[in-house]
Amino acid sequence: MEKTFNLTRRDDGIAILTMDVPGETMNTLKAQFGPEISEILAEIKSDPHIRGLVLISGKKDSFVAGADISMLDACKTAGDAKALSQQGHVVFNELEALKIPVVAAIHGACLGGGLELALACHQRVCSDDGKTMLGVPEVQLGLLPGGGGTQRLPRLVGITTALDMMLTGKQIRSKQALKMGLVNDVVPQTILLQTAVEMALTGKRAPKPVKKSLVNQVLEGTSFGRNIIFDQATKQVEKKTQGNYPAPAKIIDCVRQGIAKGMQKGLEVEASHFAELVVSKESEALRSIFFATTEMKKETGAEGATPRKVKKAVILGGGLMGGGIASVTTTKAKIPVRVKDISEKGLSNALAYAYKLLDKGVKRRHMTPAARDNLMALMTTTTEYKGVKDADIIVEAVFEDLALKHQMVKDIERECGEHTIFASNTSSLPISQIAEAATRPENVIGLHYFSPVEKMPLVEVIAHAKTSPETIATTVAFARKQGKTPIVVQDGAGFYVNRILALYMNEAAQLLLEGQSVEHLDKALVKFGFPVGPITLLDEVGIDVGAKISPILEKELGERFKAPAAFDKLLGDDRKGRKNGKGFYQYGASSKKTKAVDETVYGVLGIKPGTNKDAKALAERCVVQMLNEAVRCLDDGIIASPRDGDIGAIFGIGFPPFLGGPFHYIDTLGAANLVKILESYQSQFGNRFEPCERLKTMARENVSFF
């Protein structure tokens, strides 16, 4: 059996320990490595000729990308998970206790358990390559660093910096890591090993004291000050997580106890808290999302189909969506883009939008001005159909006007090649209707982005009955290159995300008309776990957009999609939301950082806010509508699987990740319980709450989705 760790000795007395997991593109730590590492460490200790040790990766662009997450699923109890953490502690403590200097030579991803391994070394040097990133992202999986990270990191970089890294899961670039004292040196990759060897030959060096602000020195230097840091961090965590994620509070406790009671006690607390989190429902849900997205990356979207290579893209429309799509195509996919708009102003806006996003990277020193300009050079503009002939894909991002889209399909078929894909960014029009104007309908597909394009990770790839498998596979691959998570959905009004969102939003509007205040409604759904409340979301998306989509959904899908009268009243008062500075909330220069409700909106709606109902009950009434409709979408074949439905809702509308998505949440609630809740609402508020047939069947047969 091939070994993962290979020890070689140099003539100068430095041993090189190379980690290279057989058959994997990246190194990950596995439970079975413990005995192998211990054996090697025993060999090193028994050899008096070894003067120093350098740890390096045998992989091209990865030091250690973290622990193998799948081994956590093998933990049947908290005891199993605790043993896993303790095993890591034993090995890393053994490494740290070596009398000879130990240096980690880091190139590529150094994350999670990989950084904890590096922290157990006496010194760290990393490459200045852009691929080198350091971090402890465990919190994003509902976990904490379980290999000593909660103890070694604060001792190395300071409590405040360590908490920031662990509570956000952010990844740190080389130069930043050097500045904060996380690594001892940053060098070009070509001399990484040589530098690490020289560091090992020089002998152990005490880490340089981290430069801290006077305030931080005072706070971290006294027990009173440290308590202020921990209390402040706890308040911020409670505000951000709304109590829905247990990991951050446990991370703070690990650091607090370790600093107050010593390293050994800190490691004991870390192992216990790690174990509790591994078996928590929140972490299980977050890990299911991780596995689902990893699995989806291997799929083409159309079984057996090979995607065509996209060498050039054309974006029709230079508005907010068009500019955003053009931007991610050049900056993420590195694909040349031609933006076409009927006006020079639209084109200028698209270029300015892309430049502004790239310039942020320059200001943060993530890229050079030259790199920004090179990416901008990939984007060209035109007001005519010039320079579009050789395009592999056309992404249309114009108004929701079927006649206009028909004209564009005809124009593209006339101007471009027979394999050119026409992808529409429509949010409401069925793709089959757009394809009616095509002589090559197999090339027509939907590609629905969410706003703002550069931030929202999801795209819906919408296939109609005649879309070819090759078109689907090519569009999915194109979206992935843009840094998106695509889900393939079938054609139908609202597709998947807008369809489940519409009922949720309608119910929130209904509650508003029943006398619930805007603020209370929004807070109730944020407390439930959504990033923003439904009324804030309506202001952001545009009240006019919601009003336009609702009749289409009602016509195609039935009366349950009938929008409350609120929309018409708001539009009658020219309230479109943030876009025109007039909606449910106050906008403009005078508005404070914390948005205030525009109280005049109640008069427009002809209501007076009454007694606020229980927040949990309000959230439930909105959310069960979404759950019921998600199952209908599965029944109608709009989505291919519960997995796709979960990912679509989480990445498209911010469904609470700790619940795992609508289908995971239904399993948690139990189908029978959900049916009972829906039937109770149906008796009070009418047939829009009628449970779908599949849910009733699942309730009767006591089955789940996963």
Swiss-Prot record:
One of its GO terms (biological process) is fatty acid beta-oxidation. SUPFAM superfamilies: 6-phosphogluconate dehydrogenase C-terminal domain-like, ClpP/crotonase, NAD(P)-binding Rossmann-fold domains. Residues 1-188 are annotated as: Enoyl-CoA hydratase. Its EC number is 4.2.1.17, 5.1.2.3, 1.1.1.35. It is found in: Cytoplasm. The keyword Cell inner membrane does not apply. Keywords: Cytoplasm, Fatty acid metabolism, Isomerase, Lipid degradation, Lipid metabolism, Lyase, Multifunctional enzyme, NAD, Oxidoreductase. One of its GO terms (cellular component) is cytoplasm. In the N-terminal section; belongs to the enoyl-CoA hydratase/isomerase family. This is Fatty acid oxidation complex subunit alpha. It comes from Shewanella sp. (strain W3-18-1).
